[in-house]
Swiss-Prot record:
It is found in: Cytoplasm. Its main location: cytoplasm. It comes from the Bacteria. SUPFAM superfamilies: Aminomethyltransferase beta-barrel domain, Folate-binding domain. InterPro entries: GcvT/YgfZ_C (IPR029043), tRNA-modifying_YgfZ (IPR023758), YgfZ/GcvT (IPR045179), YgfZ/GcvT_CS (IPR017703), YgfZ_barrel (IPR048451). Belongs to the tRNA-modifying YgfZ family. Coiled coil: none annotated. This is tRNA-modifying protein YgfZ. Folate-binding protein involved in regulating the level of ATP-DnaA and in the modification of some tRNAs. It is probably a key factor in regulatory networks that act via tRNA modification, such as initiation of chromosomal replication. GO terms for molecular function: folic acid binding. Folate binds at W27, W189.
């Protein structure tokens, strides 16, 4: 019996989100197993996975030789290897790149479509899950396991949980929360990631940006002390030579349409508008507000005014829940 996804509804902001169970169809799970798995993944991503405990998950980038990101990966340990979650639109291309050198190592890299990805967020999310699972993650233990389920804890923009589980547990959870929780699709989790300033790399932006252009250093996703990995030289140069002039920004406001990933924005310059930046993700909330995650110059004025191209409405900068000060 397959897991049936949930119909879409406009997402809510974290501040006014009721208890919500979210089907994460736009994200995908993959694994690497085998005796060489840690050594192999360590040589491919920006974070130092050798320092990761069983109770941690972290965001890392998988880059090309020029330091441009194929994708960002939400990594955690699993059995004799690692699992990671990324946007489904980049899955195939990212796995192809990751497997390029696998023939020389004792590893198996594969997508995992057997398991289900769910988000639980909103009002009293912890209390709702405590009725179902015997243990829940928190700031100290960000990853816990309960039977067939792995639960990941997220602090921002408000406490929320990501579940990696089997079909039976997913259906059981849906049934238990029926009537108590709203059901929504990936757009709700996307809205929360945008609010949290977690970079969303879809196919349109794969291979376009170095990690620092999406604030990955501020999210603990880059180690400048670990050994070699693909793209390391360019990532290090951006830090030590100050070569990175871009950052990830959160914008909010109104627009007559929801722009696509890869589109640019327009910045108000006196009476005129100038094209700028690249949109990573955007979504419209249930109150009509548009949230936009974009990579733009890192020296923008806080009161800068933007718009979706040729739109009559405007967008403004919203502070992120973390600092970019090094």
């Amino acid at each position: 019996m397959a897991f049936i996804s949930f119909p879409p509804r406009h997402p809510s902001s974290s501040a006014r989100l009721p208890l919500t169970l979210i089907a994460l169809d736009d994200w995908a799970l993959s694994t690497i197993t085998g005796v060489d798995s840690e050594k192999y993944i360590q040589g491919q991503v920006t974070a130092d996975v050798s320092q990761m405990t069983e109770q941690q998950h972290l965001l890392a980038a998988h880059c090309d030789a020029k330091g441009k990101m194929w994708s960002t990966l939400r990594l955690f340990r699993e059995r004799d290897g690692f699992a990671w979650i990324e946007r489904r639109s980049v899955l195939e291309a990212q796995l192809t790149e990751l497997k390029k050198y696998a023939v020389f190592s004792k590893v198996v890299i594969a997508p995992d479509d057997e398991r289900v990805l769910l988000g639980v967020a909103g009002f009293q999310a912890r209390a709702a899950l405590a009725n179902v699972f015997s243990v829940l993650p928190n700031s100290e233990n960000q990853v816990v396991r309960d039977g067939a389920s792995t639960l990941l804890w997220f602090e921002h923009p408000a406490e929320r949980f990501l579940l990696v589980t089997d079909v039976a547990t997913a259906n059981m959870l849906t049934e238990k929360l029926h009537g108590e929780a709203e059901l929504n699709n990936s757009q709700q989790w996307l809205a929360l990631d945008i609010e949290a300033g977690i970079p969303v790399i879809d196919a349109a932006n794969s291979g376009q940006f170095i990690p620092q252009a999406t604030n990955l250093q501020a999210l603990g996703g880059i180690s400048f002390k670990k050994g070699c990995y693909t793209g390391q030289e360019m990532v290090a140069r951006a830090k030590f030579r100050g070569a990175n002039k871009r950052a990830l920004w959160l914008l909010a406001g109104k627009a007559s349409r929801v722009p696509e990933a890869g589109e640019d924005l327009e910045l108000q310059m006196g009476e005129n508008w100038r094209r700028t930046g690249a949109i990573l993700a955007a979504t419209q909330l249930d109150d009509g507000q548009l949230l936009v995650q974009a990579v733009m110059n890192n020296d923008l004025e806080a009161e800068s005014v933007f718009r979706v191209r040729d739109d009559a409405n405007t967008l403004h900068i919203v502070p992120l829940p973390y600092s970019l000060e090094e």
